[in-house]
């Protein structure tokens, strides 16, 4: 029944290779797709313990659910740096500004929108090194942002529609 509804019931993995960029070498990623449904929480929690980074997928129409908050707490417990992808933004009722307010209200001001033009002020409020760079140069340095993400001070938020491959480029780069 879960499979018929498209619910992941076991963790699955895929190996992805991102091509080299002018400023980065080719990158190999191991993607673990874990169950998002509350009935399979134990399976998801086992996978969280081995992650270097996580992408927490949230519905653009439904927003943060109770189980999403449980996953968020587990990601914090295991200190997993987390990116947020708000999916289904192509559907009626999906509103990026509403979702960002909700994310900040539930998960903190470290949730910063990364899809459109950068907001240096929002990023600066997440860590002292980011603040210093924004005050000095108007923009935080890339490496400083990466460090803030790794330390779970910044949680980059991306918006798109995964089935249409919309919004994924920014997330992957």
Protein language model annotation of sequence segments:
Residues 1-62, 66, 71:
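Conserved P-loop/Walker A NTP-binding site and adjacent catalytic elements of P-loop NTPases
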Residues 60-173:
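P-loop NTPase catalytic nucleotide-binding module
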